[in-house]
Swiss-Prot record:
One of its GO terms (biological process) is nucleoside catabolic process. Catalyzes the irreversible cleavage of the glycosidic bond in both 5'-methylthioadenosine (MTA) and S-adenosylhomocysteine (SAH/AdoHcy) to adenine and the corresponding thioribose, 5'-methylthioribose and S-ribosylhomocysteine, respectively. Also cleaves 5'-deoxyadenosine, a toxic by-product of radical S-adenosylmethionine (SAM) enzymes, into 5-deoxyribose and adenine. It is an enzyme of class 3 (hydrolase). Keywords: Amino-acid biosynthesis, Hydrolase, Methionine biosynthesis. NCBIfam families: MTA_SAH-Nsdase (TIGR01704), PRK05584.1 (NF004079). It comes from Bacillus velezensis (strain DSM 23117 / BGSC 10A6 / LMG 26770 / FZB42). This is 5'-methylthioadenosine/S-adenosylhomocysteine nucleosidase. One of its GO terms (molecular function) is adenosylhomocysteine nucleosidase activity. Pathway: Amino-acid biosynthesis; L-methionine biosynthesis via salvage pathway; S-methyl-5-thio-alpha-D-ribose 1-phosphate from S-methyl-5'-thioadenosine (hydrolase route): step 1/2.
Length: 231
């Protein structure tokens, strides 16, 4: 069993890296890959860099060179659903682009031509993640749609524009749809596990700086519990 875990920033991968046994690092095209094992599972940890282009490049390298059986994209996100608070964790049911618009040619908003409007997370990985939640104390976990764009969502108008397009959106961030799109094209099962560092549009830049570390801890705790169950 070979599992890949992708985080964009150092804060999002540092805890998991420290847990890997016999860890070895390799830089490929400015992307940092760390291979090792955790609880008997072979793990490839990728620090992708921020944004959709970085995520797509690094995920393509990951899937082509390391050929993992499953992919988990983890890290922080901005909360969108009214029930969520900073520190909560969102598990993806599906992932969409929130900054793609070719509706003039009869595609759905967020749909890249020739590809699905939504990238469905793997049901087995969702189920394992839900089981893994049971070991976490004091962390609220929700399941729903995550949307991706190359903008940090601290502008209330931008937040409302995106909210108007997606009625039941749980979280927004800057890499997951790119990861999901590449996984779709490689036919590799994936799930996204994101902890909320901020609530989109509500002084989110201040909240992000303050709560990024907490979000990283929460998301990594859940990822580690998933790895234990993924044999």
């Amino acid at each position: 069993m070979k599992l890949a875990v992708i985080g964009a920033m150092e804060e999002e991968v540092t805890i998991l890296r420290s847990k890997l046994k016999d860890a070895k690092q390799e830089m490929i095209a400015h992307c940092e890959f760390t291979t090792g094992s955790y609880e008997g599972v072979e793990v490839i940890l990728l620090k992708s860099g921020i944004g959709k282009v970085n995520a797509a490049i690094s995920t393509t390298l990951l899937l082509d060179r390391f050929k993992p059986d499953y992919v988990i994209n983890t890290g922080s996100a901005g909360g969108f659903h009214h029930t969520l608070n900073v520190g909560d964790v969102v598990i993806s049911t599906d992932v969409r682009h929130h900054d793609v618009d070719v509706t003039a040619f009869d595609y759905e908003y967020g749909q890249v031509p020739g590809l699905p409007a939504a990238y469905k997370a793997d049901e087995k990985l969702i189920s394992i993640t839900e089981e893994a939640v049971s070991e976490l104390n004091g962390i609220q976990v929700a399941k729903g749609t995550i949307a991706t764009g190359d903008s940090f969502m601290n502008d209330p108008k931008r937040v409302e524009d995106v909210r108007a397009k997606f009625a039941d959106l749980y979280a927004v961030e800057m890499e997951a749809a790119a990861v999901a799109q590449v996984c779709h094209q490689f036919k590799t099962p994936f799930v996204v596990i994101r902890a909320l560092s901020d609530i989109a549009g509500k002084e989110s830049d201040v909240s992000f700086d303050k709560f990024l570390e907490q979000a990283a801890v929460h998301s990594t705790e859940l990822v580690l519990n998933v790895i234990k169950r993924i044999h």
